[in-house]
């Protein structure tokens, strides 16, 4: 995985980054952002748009904004996913029992999980196993956005 990341062949999930950071003894919040957006005691933490970390696919057609706090990585992750026309976000299987929930906010996308594929339009949500090879595509002419939630097994 490290070799693939270094060669820009894959984008790691937050869970993978979290495990790597723990193995290396590095604070993931410091790695991804100077302002981790932690919750102050008794207050509301506001994370400015410039402080939200983002991952881009090697071809630049897909962007994942990491909306969830780093301390939940490996349990729950949520992202704002933007895919340009013709873009594909392909993923290898995550650990057994992992589920993804994709809610299309604008445009249209298709989801493939294993051998099954479904098309989604604005406002629709797909829930699917992510412990098999899976991909999210934008086959339309316009940019599409979605909320992607990854739930890891307990």
Where are these regions (language model features)?
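Short acidic-glycine-tyrosine-enriched beta hairpin
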Residues: 67, 114-130
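Long, hydrophobic alpha-helical segments
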Residues: 14-17
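A short, N-terminal "cap"/entry segment at the start of jelly-roll beta-barrel domains
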Residues: 22-75
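Glycine- and acidic-residue-biased ligand/ion/polar-headgroup-sensing regions
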Residues: 96-114
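Recognition helix of helix-turn-helix/homeodomain-like DNA-binding domains
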Residues: 1-12
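Ligand-binding loop in jelly-roll beta-barrel domains
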Residues: 60-63, 121-122, 130-154
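A short beta-loop-beta micro-motif enriched in histidine and acidic residues
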Residues: 72-76, 87-101
């Amino acid at each position: 995985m490290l070799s693939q990341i270094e060669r820009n062949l894959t984008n790691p999930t937050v869970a993978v980054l979290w495990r790597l950071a723990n193995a290396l003894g590095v604070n993931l919040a410091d790695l991804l952002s100077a302002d981790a957006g932690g919750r102050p005691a008794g207050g509301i933490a506001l994370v400015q748009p410039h402080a939200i970390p983002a991952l881009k696919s090697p071809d630049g057609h897909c962007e994942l904004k990491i909306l969830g706090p780093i301390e939940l990585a490996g349990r729950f992750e949520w992202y704002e996913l933007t895919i340009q026309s013709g873009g594909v976000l392909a993923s290898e299987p995550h650990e057994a029992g992992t589920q993804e929930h994709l809610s299309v906010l604008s445009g249209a996308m298709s989801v493939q999980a294993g051998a099954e594929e479904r098309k989604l339009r604005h406002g629709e949500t797909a829930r699917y196993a992510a412990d098999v090879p899976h991909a999210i595509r934008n086959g339309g002419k316009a940019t599409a956005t979605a909320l992607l939630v990854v739930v890891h097994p307990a």
